């Protein structure tokens, strides 16, 4: 007898094969059988008329604050998501000096419209460095798995302090310090690094996020830090202005480090390049040996 049988559901197994009606048996933490009629289970779920799939991986979320206090991770866990990735778009809460907590909250509130009052009341700030933030996440049991990137906004605020403002130009020493923080974060368990370079992303005070005015040199040096580790994803939201030549440096970075670079491929009023040109330019760089991957939204824009 199996521990659990999910019976009569329409199974989409993720392999690319056509959906089929069948049963799924689970024993312990293992799916032990998939297919036709399966013997009885100690617990059975009638999934007739329902779709049964592997858990969804949501690669672009902003649970950075909520993940420090909420075990349920709603609403994602309500909709079949079993793994979620946060720390996108260059916004998050580590590293964090005590005098920059409010600034980081204002950045997240402005970019993602998450109420600052909820973040201020929910987060305990029992971390300063990025590895300490990962430790804080590890302390809380939750219903889904989480992963996170190191966030550009927090890194710049940590290194530049009060000098951080739109258009601030970090010194070579500043850039080296930022690269070291990112390298330490990835070695500690971060999945990669994220930044934002779009005028649509502003703090609650209306200021552009730090990555929008960052130079390609700064971003490439941070990417090289992940290259030294040997793994990591470089994630970016960008307006893709033609004069920025984003795909040129993304391609160079990917070829140099061997790491993937991913960007938000959207048909947006803020993007100068139409979606078709974004994809075509990405493919041109990939033909040259880069590994640039487009993040596509599942809803229309």
Predicted regions and their residues:
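Histidine/acidic residue-rich metal-binding segments in metalloenzymes
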Residues: 131-142, 167-301
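Short, basic, glycine/proline-bearing loop/turn elements
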Residues: 53-62, 164-167, 265-267
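Short coil/turn connectors at secondary-structure junctions
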Residues: 1-2, 40-42, 48, 52-54, ...
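Di-metal (Zn2+ and/or Mg2+/Mn2+) metal-binding site signature of metallo-dependent hydrolases
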Residues: 51-75
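Divalent-metal coordination cores built from histidine and acidic residues
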Residues: 69-192
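Histidine-rich, glycine-flanked metal-binding segment
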Residues: 1-5, 11-55
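Divalent metal-coordination and catalytic microenvironments
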Residues: 9, 29, 49, 60, ...
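Acidic, glycine-rich active-site loops and adjacent beta-strand->loop/helix elements
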Residues: 62-65, 89-92, 240-242, 267-269
């Amino acid at each position: 007898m199996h521990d659990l049988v999910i019976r009569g559901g329409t199974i989409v197994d993720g392999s690319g094969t056509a959906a089929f009606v069948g049963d799924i048996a689970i024993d312990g933490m293992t799916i032990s059988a998939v297919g036709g009629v399966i013997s009885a289970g100690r617990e059975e779920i009638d999934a007739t008329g329902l779709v049964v799939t592997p858990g969804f991986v949501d690669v672009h979320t902003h649970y950075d604050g909520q993940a420090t206090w909420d075990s349920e991770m709603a609403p994602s866990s309500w909709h079949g998501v079993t793994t979620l990735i946060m720390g996108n778009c260059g916004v998050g809460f580590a590293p964090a000096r005590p005098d920059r907590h409010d600034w980081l909250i204002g950045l997240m509130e402005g970019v993602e419209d998450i109420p600052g009052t909820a973040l201020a009341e929910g987060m305990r700030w029992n971390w300063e460095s990025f590895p300490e933030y990962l430790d804080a996440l590890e302390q809380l049991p939750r219903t889904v798995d989480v992963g996170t990137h190191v966030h550009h906004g927090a890194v710049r605020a940590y290194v530049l302090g009060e000098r951080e403002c739109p258009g601030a130009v970090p010194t070579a020493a500043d850039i080296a310090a930022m690269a070291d923080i990112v390298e330490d974060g990835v070695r500690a368990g971060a999945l990669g690094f994220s930044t934002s370079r779009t005028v649509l992303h502003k703090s609650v005070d209306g200021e552009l996020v730090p990555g929008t005015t960052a130079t390609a040199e700064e971003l490439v040096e941070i990417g090289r830090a992940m290259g030294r580790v040997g793994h990591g994803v470089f994630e970016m939201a960008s307006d893709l202005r033609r004069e920025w030549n984003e795909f040129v440096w993304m391609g160079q970075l990917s070829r140099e480090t061997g790491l993937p670079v991913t960007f938000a491929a959207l048909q947006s009023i803020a993007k100068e390049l139409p979606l078709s040109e974004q994809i075509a330019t990405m493919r041109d760089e990939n033909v040259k040996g880069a590994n640039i991957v487009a993040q596509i939204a599942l809803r229309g824009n």
